Amino acid sequence: MENKSKLIVLSILFTPNNILYYATQLNGNIIFWTSSGVHKQKNTKKVTLISITTVINYIKYKSVNYKGIHIRTKGFSKNKKLVIKQLKQSTLNILSISDKISWPHNGCKKRKIRRI
């Protein structure tokens, strides 16, 4: 199957314990996905600099045949700037970067904090 547009959308979902990466075509069909846990990183090691660079190297390897990449990020993490910086330093042709943050406007009540 030949991709005519040669553009992909890289969606990055930041969760508290992991970072998920989805590469899709412009119409939404998933090309590949990966995460830090797929690359043999476990527990708190999944959000370190070493695991981020290994995943970005994998993304570079998989997206060689594409002309450009649109990046969409979602979620909260202290490593968001680090991931975007690593992607900018790579040889990928980044066309746009968008960030979707959903702040609650005093919505649902927070969970009760667990006491040990």
Curated annotation (Swiss-Prot):
Location of the protein in the cell: Mitochondrion
Keyword Ribosomal protein assigned to the entry: answer is: yes
Q: Does the keyword Ribonucleoprotein apply?
A: yes
- Could you tell me which SUPFAM superfamilies the record lists for this protein? Translational machinery components
Top-rank lineage group of the source organism: Eukaryota
User: Which keywords label this protein?
Assistant: Mitochondrion, Ribonucleoprotein, Ribosomal protein
Q: Mind telling me which Pfam families this protein's record contains?
A: Ribosomal_S11
User: Which GO biological process entries does UniProt record here?
Assistant: translation
Name any one GO molecular function.
structural constituent of ribosome
Cite the InterPro entries for this sequence.
Ribosomal_uS11, Ribosomal_uS11_sf
- Write out the GO cellular component annotations: mitochondrion; ribonucleoprotein complex; ribosome
HAMAP family for this protein = Ribosomal_uS11
- Family to which the UniProt record says this protein belongs: Belongs to the universal ribosomal protein uS11 family.
Name of the protein in question: Small ribosomal subunit protein uS11m
User: Which species expresses this protein natively?
Assistant: Chondrus crispus (Carrageen Irish moss)
Gene designation = RPS11
